[in-house]
Amino acid sequence: MVVSDPVADFLTRIRNGTKAQHRYVDVNWSKMKQTLAEILKNQGFIENYLVKVDEGQRGTIRIFLKYTNGRRPVIQGLKRISKPGLRKYVGHQDIPRFYGNMGLSIVSTSQGVMAGNEATQRGIGGELLCLIW
């Protein structure tokens, strides 16, 4: 299936999986999606992820969702900011920090995709991909 916005598809699969309280969700592999999964893991929003590649087929990423003891999802919300039809670029001073720094912004910079706080520390801006809280 051809997807016009792979990042939005990635976020939607995670959102739907947490609402249905699935243990994991599968998404088609791409380098961007693997980087997003790595950021979510490092920031504590998901348990883990696993890249699976079957011979002769496109790979998949299995994302293991994280829940609190009361089966409440750690990811409460996801929002796509920069879209294919309307890109949103920010300087390092304008990268959003919200929910008392409990939320996460993800930025695509000239040095790669990274968490907003890391981009701010490095003093680089870029395309604001999404917000996660």
UniProtKB/Swiss-Prot annotation:
The keyword rRNA-binding applies. It comes from Protochlamydia amoebophila (strain UWE25). GO terms for molecular function: rRNA binding; structural constituent of ribosome. Belongs to the universal ribosomal protein uS8 family. One of the primary rRNA binding proteins, it binds directly to 16S rRNA central domain where it helps coordinate assembly of the platform of the 30S subunit. This is Small ribosomal subunit protein uS8. One of its GO terms (biological process) is translation. InterPro entries: Ribosomal_uS8, Ribosomal_uS8_sf. The keyword Kinase does not apply. Part of the 30S ribosomal subunit. Contacts proteins S5 and S12. GO terms for cellular component: ribonucleoprotein complex; ribosome. Keywords: Ribonucleoprotein, Ribosomal protein, RNA-binding, rRNA-binding. It comes from the Bacteria.
